[in-house]
From Swiss-Prot:
One of its GO terms (molecular function) is 3'-tRNA processing endoribonuclease activity. The gene is rnpA. HAMAP family: RNase_P (MF_00227). Residues 122-135 have a biased composition (Polar residues). This is Ribonuclease P protein component. Keywords: Endonuclease, Hydrolase, Nuclease, RNA-binding, tRNA processing. Gene3D superfamilies: 3.30.230.10. Belongs to the RnpA family. It comes from Chloroflexus aggregans (strain MD-66 / DSM 9485). Residues 115-135 are annotated as: Disordered.
Amino acid sequence: MRRANRLRRPAQFRRVRQTGRTFSSAWLTLTVAPGRRDGVRCGFITGRRLGKAVQRNRARRRVREAVRLLLPSLTTGYDLLFAIRSPEVIEAPFSQLQADIIRLLRQACLLTTPETEPVSPVSPTSLPQNERGSP
Protein backbone atom coordinates (compact mmCIF):
# COMPACT_ATOMS: atom_id res chain seq x y z
CA MET A 1 0.00 0.00 0.00
CA ARG A 2 1.38 3.39 -0.97
CA ARG A 3 2.59 5.75 1.74
CA ALA A 4 -0.07 8.33 0.80
CA ASN A 5 -2.76 5.75 1.63
CA ARG A 6 -1.53 4.92 5.14
CA LEU A 7 -2.14 6.37 8.57
CA ARG A 8 1.30 6.55 10.12
CA ARG A 9 1.41 8.74 13.21
CA PRO A 10 -0.09 7.91 16.62
CA ALA A 11 -1.98 11.22 16.54
CA GLN A 12 -3.69 10.17 13.30
CA PHE A 13 -4.77 6.84 14.81
CA ARG A 14 -5.98 8.62 17.97
CA ARG A 15 -8.03 11.14 15.97
CA VAL A 16 -9.78 8.39 13.98
CA ARG A 17 -10.54 6.41 17.17
CA GLN A 18 -11.93 9.47 18.97
CA THR A 19 -13.96 11.07 16.17
CA GLY A 20 -14.83 8.11 13.96
CA ARG A 21 -17.87 5.91 13.56
CA THR A 22 -17.40 2.18 14.23
CA PHE A 23 -18.62 -0.87 12.30
CA SER A 24 -17.94 -4.44 13.47
CA SER A 25 -17.85 -7.97 12.14
CA ALA A 26 -16.71 -11.22 13.69
CA TRP A 27 -13.12 -10.72 12.54
CA LEU A 28 -12.63 -6.94 12.21
CA THR A 29 -13.68 -3.57 13.53
CA LEU A 30 -13.70 -0.67 11.07
CA THR A 31 -13.57 2.91 12.35
CA VAL A 32 -14.26 5.64 9.78
CA ALA A 33 -13.55 9.35 10.23
CA PRO A 34 -13.55 12.24 7.75
CA GLY A 35 -10.04 12.86 6.48
CA ARG A 36 -8.23 14.50 3.60
CA ARG A 37 -10.34 15.19 0.52
CA ASP A 38 -7.88 13.83 -2.02
CA GLY A 39 -7.77 10.18 -0.98
CA VAL A 40 -8.31 7.43 1.53
CA ARG A 41 -5.84 6.64 4.30
CA CYS A 42 -5.89 3.32 6.15
CA GLY A 43 -4.40 2.10 9.40
CA PHE A 44 -4.24 -1.43 10.77
CA ILE A 45 -4.19 -2.47 14.43
CA THR A 46 -3.53 -5.88 15.96
CA GLY A 47 -3.57 -6.58 19.68
CA ARG A 48 -1.29 -8.94 21.54
CA ARG A 49 -4.12 -11.38 22.22
CA LEU A 50 -4.00 -12.22 18.50
CA GLY A 51 -0.71 -14.04 19.05
CA LYS A 52 2.98 -13.41 18.84
CA ALA A 53 4.55 -10.91 16.45
CA VAL A 54 4.66 -13.34 13.52
CA GLN A 55 0.90 -13.97 13.71
CA ARG A 56 0.08 -10.29 14.22
CA ASN A 57 2.22 -9.26 11.24
CA ARG A 58 0.70 -11.93 9.02
CA ALA A 59 -2.85 -10.88 9.94
CA ARG A 60 -1.98 -7.24 9.24
CA ARG A 61 -0.42 -8.10 5.87
CA ARG A 62 -3.47 -10.12 4.77
CA VAL A 63 -5.95 -7.40 5.71
CA ARG A 64 -3.75 -4.70 4.17
CA GLU A 65 -3.63 -6.57 0.86
CA ALA A 66 -7.40 -7.13 0.81
CA VAL A 67 -7.96 -3.41 1.41
CA ARG A 68 -5.32 -2.42 -1.17
CA LEU A 69 -7.22 -4.31 -3.87
CA LEU A 70 -10.38 -2.37 -2.97
CA LEU A 71 -8.79 1.12 -2.79
CA PRO A 72 -9.84 2.23 -6.30
CA SER A 73 -13.50 1.57 -5.49
CA LEU A 74 -13.55 3.49 -2.18
CA THR A 75 -15.09 6.92 -1.63
CA THR A 76 -12.34 9.50 -1.08
CA GLY A 77 -12.09 11.85 1.88
CA TYR A 78 -12.01 9.34 4.73
CA ASP A 79 -9.52 7.80 7.12
CA LEU A 80 -10.12 4.12 7.89
CA LEU A 81 -8.85 2.16 10.86
CA PHE A 82 -9.07 -1.64 10.74
CA ALA A 83 -8.68 -3.38 14.11
CA ILE A 84 -8.16 -7.12 13.76
CA ARG A 85 -10.19 -8.89 16.44
CA SER A 86 -9.84 -12.58 15.72
CA PRO A 87 -6.92 -14.92 15.03
CA GLU A 88 -9.15 -16.61 12.43
CA VAL A 89 -8.06 -13.85 10.01
CA ILE A 90 -4.71 -15.61 9.69
CA GLU A 91 -6.10 -18.95 8.47
CA ALA A 92 -9.33 -17.84 6.76
CA PRO A 93 -9.53 -18.11 2.96
CA PHE A 94 -8.62 -14.79 1.36
CA SER A 95 -11.98 -14.59 -0.42
CA GLN A 96 -13.85 -14.81 2.92
CA LEU A 97 -11.61 -12.17 4.44
CA GLN A 98 -12.21 -9.88 1.48
CA ALA A 99 -15.97 -10.50 1.62
CA ASP A 100 -15.94 -9.52 5.31
CA ILE A 101 -14.10 -6.28 4.50
CA ILE A 102 -16.52 -5.51 1.65
CA ARG A 103 -19.44 -6.06 4.04
CA LEU A 104 -17.95 -3.56 6.51
CA LEU A 105 -17.25 -1.00 3.78
CA ARG A 106 -20.82 -1.34 2.51
CA GLN A 107 -22.17 -0.75 6.03
CA ALA A 108 -20.07 2.41 6.15
CA CYS A 109 -21.32 3.42 2.64
CA LEU A 110 -17.75 3.74 1.35
CA LEU A 111 -17.88 1.63 -1.83
CA THR A 112 -18.38 3.77 -4.94
CA THR A 113 -19.10 0.83 -7.24
CA PRO A 114 -21.55 -1.94 -6.41
CA GLU A 115 -19.34 -4.97 -5.89
CA THR A 116 -21.09 -8.23 -6.68
CA GLU A 117 -18.17 -10.40 -5.61
CA PRO A 118 -14.75 -9.88 -4.02
CA VAL A 119 -11.91 -8.67 -6.21
CA SER A 120 -9.67 -11.57 -7.10
CA PRO A 121 -5.91 -11.12 -6.64
CA VAL A 122 -5.42 -13.80 -9.33
CA SER A 123 -6.22 -13.08 -12.96
CA PRO A 124 -8.27 -15.72 -14.83
CA THR A 125 -5.43 -16.33 -17.29
CA SER A 126 -3.06 -17.35 -14.49
CA LEU A 127 -5.34 -20.24 -13.47
CA PRO A 128 -4.91 -23.72 -14.95
CA GLN A 129 -7.07 -24.38 -18.00
CA ASN A 130 -9.45 -26.71 -16.14
CA GLU A 131 -10.19 -24.06 -13.46
CA ARG A 132 -11.00 -21.22 -15.87
CA GLY A 133 -14.62 -20.32 -16.42
CA SER A 134 -16.05 -20.51 -19.93
CA PRO A 135 -16.26 -17.12 -21.73
